[in-house]
Design a protein with these regions (language model features):
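Active-site neighborhoods and metal-handling regions in enzymes and metal-associated proteins
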Residues: 1-170
Length: 170
């Protein structure tokens, strides 16, 4: 969709917002239905949202970044979708985008260790077709290369000894 196009009933649109409070950032995204959407669009949105929570459940102190990506990727691919690889989640703190990168694909037990106090954004971007995307000339708009539907959900979480804590519930 071109940024000049108007949204119509049946479209889905992703909105990604950041906020800053007392010098610290938060990052949150969701995909919304414009009116009634096709069963395919609803299923894609539901799968993407649930893959976010699969990733969050895998974000345990002592685990690895790859555990998160593997949880997201396994859930998504088991349902016939693909995970965008060009964009990933990230650390969050005094800057909106910090290390470490948090891919939505990966191998369990690989990557940096998750430690209590780490704050990260997990943000699966899931395509109904292939995983390739293209950035439009405006430098912001991203479309799937094959024209398929895509959905995106994100939460900022803190790793704690008692499990992950979601910081961006709205």
């Amino acid at each position: 969709m071109c940024i000049r196009d108007r949204l119509r009933a049946g479209d889905i649109v992703s909105i990604d917002l950041g906020a800053k409070f007392d010098g610290y950032h938060g990052d949150n995204a969701a995909t919304f239905a414009c009116g009634d959407v096709s069963p395919e669009a609803k299923r894609l949105m539901d799968t993407t949202r649930e893959s976010l929570y699969e990733g969050i459940r895998a974000a345990c102190a002592g685990g690895r970044i790859g555990d998160i990506g593997h949880a997201v990727q396994s859930y998504v691919e088991a349902r016939g979708y693909s995970v965008v690889r060009q964009f990933v989640g990230h650390g969050v703190g005094t800057h909106l985008h910090e290390a470490p990168e948090v891919p939505n694909f990966g191998t369990p037990g690989r990557g940096i260790r998750l430690l209590p106090g780490m704050t990260i954004a997990i943000e699966p971007m899931v395509n109904a077709g292939g995983y390739d995307v293209k950035v439009q000339p405006d430098g912001w708009t991203v479309l799937t290369k094959d024209g398929s539907l895509s959905a995106h959900f994100e939460h900022t979480i803190v790793i704690t000894a008692d499990g992950p804590k979601i910081m961006t519930v709205v």
